[in-house]
């Protein structure tokens, strides 16, 4: 069911991560500057925002399974939707493509690698990891907004997700 949202934030890493202790889940603020900046914006928007991110750790995934993520709107002031991505697919998406290829390209260090072309391994990682994950993020984002919402995709991890969303929703306001 679509909800009345103003902003859909989409990133690989979310605003919090879960840590299990004595059978209970505690949240820790997400690492890096992205979390602090977007968390502030999401809190200002409150119920008019949702943050979609990967469930990265096993504790994140278990928190999803046990329903611990349902307490996040009360704790944070906005909704969070975590995606459970298969570990092998995530490795291709995050490590093989995002970190080993796109990080260098986006930081103008491509020439330092002295790579003139990619092999089958990189192509497989793109086709079986990076693209499917980006498509999934775009699909989930499309389930979380009304037409007047702004969808913000963050960082090179999700470089192709806006295009997938644009195909399905040509008039949607999208930032990347």
Residue ranges with predicted function:
Residues 1-176:
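Catalytic cores of carbohydrate-active enzymes across secretory and cytosolic contexts
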């Amino acid at each position: 069911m679509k909800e009345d949202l103003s902003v859909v934030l989409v990133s690989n890493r979310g605003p919090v991560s879960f840590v299990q202790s004595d059978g209970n889940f505690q949240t820790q603020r997400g690492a890096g500057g992205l979390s602090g900046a977007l968390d502030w914006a999401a809190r200002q928007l409150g119920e008019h925002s949702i943050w979609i991110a990967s469930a990265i750790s096993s504790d994140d995934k278990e928190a999803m399974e046990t329903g611990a993520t349902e307490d996040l709107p009360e704790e944070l002031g906005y909704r969070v939707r975590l995606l459970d991505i298969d570990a092998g697919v995530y490795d291709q998406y995050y490590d093989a493509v995002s970190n080993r290829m796109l990080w260098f390209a986006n930081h103008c260090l491509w020439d330092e690698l002295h790579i003139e072309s990619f092999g089958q391994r990189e192509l497989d990682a793109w086709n079986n990891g990076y693209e499917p994950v980006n498509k999934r993020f775009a699909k989930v984002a499309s389930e979380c907004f009304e037409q007047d919402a702004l969808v913000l995709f963050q960082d090179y991890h999700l470089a192709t997700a806006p295009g997938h969303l644009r195909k399905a929703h040509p008039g949607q306001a999208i930032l990347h």
